[in-house]
């Protein structure tokens, strides 16, 4: 009887990378790591550039060469450009262009992040076991796992989020995003913190200015990037502040 396939969901964040390392350290079965990449447009990743490079240049080769497992990168049929420029077909704003995603009900996650994962999972054998990066100190999230088909190696080996951070750091596999934020997400995320937004404004101004170009297009329904501000307002506010006004991102 053949054993089931073991797959690790991998965002490239500390918890999912620590899961890969634990699997290797404890000889846990693992066949494949899967990463779903959102695309801003056909040529530009939705990942923060430093994190995108970490995935492609560091993590993927590590999985394939050091761990000997397949590293699969999934993409949705839809890109953020299409989500933003979707023309509303019903209601009082019919005929207008949708615009930026809303905080708390992000269409990017719904249309660009989740669909390729669902499609991938649907093709797996029913007995496939999925490793998820949920730490020991996340009891509410752990409670949603069945412990059979969805398993947390972090919980199994008693690792907290801080432990996961340290493990990745020790192996040189900590994403550079943790120098300016606590989590990884799209660089145009409506839930991004000021530190994350400041990073894009100052380190990748050409990319952030793409959002301002979109903001200034005609017939846009939702021009706010965050709950309160448009991209141009975000940029103006952050640049007017002294950078000493921003506290460094703290490691969990």
Model-derived segments and their meaning:
Residues 1-252:
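Nucleotide-activated chemistry modules centered on ATP-dependent adenylation/adenylyltransferase
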């Amino acid at each position: 009887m053949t054993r089931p396939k073991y797959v690790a969901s991998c965002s490239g964040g500390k918890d999912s990378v620590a899961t890969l390392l634990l699997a290797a350290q404890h000889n846990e079965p693992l066949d494949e790591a899967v990463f779903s990449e959102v695309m801003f447009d056909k040529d530009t990743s939705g990942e923060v550039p430093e994190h995108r490079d970490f995935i492609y240049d560091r993590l993927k080769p590590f999985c394939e060469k050091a761990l000997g497992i397949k590293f699969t990168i999934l993409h949705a049929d839809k890109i953020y450009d299409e989500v933003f420029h979707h023309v509303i077909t019903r209601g009082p704003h019919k005929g207008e262009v949708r615009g930026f995603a809303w905080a708390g009900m992000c269409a990017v996650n719904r249309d660009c992040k989740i669909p390729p994962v669902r499609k991938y999972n649907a093709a797996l054998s029913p007995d496939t076991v999925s490793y998820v990066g949920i730490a020991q100190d996340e009891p509410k999230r752990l409670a949603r796992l069945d412990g059979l088909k969805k398993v947390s190696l972090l919980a199994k080996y008693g690792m907290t989020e801080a432990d996961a951070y340290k493990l990745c750091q020790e192996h040189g596999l900590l994403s550079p995003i943790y120098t300016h934020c606590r989590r990884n997400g799209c660089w145009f995320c409506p839930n991004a913190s000021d530190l994350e937004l400041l990073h894009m404004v100052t380190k990748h101004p050409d990319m952030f200015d793409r959002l301002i170009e979109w903001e200034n297009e005609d017939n846009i329904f939702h021009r706010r990037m965050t709950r309160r501000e448009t991209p141009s307002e975000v940029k103006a506010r952050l640049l007017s502040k002294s950078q000493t006004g921003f506290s460094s991102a703290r490691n969990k």
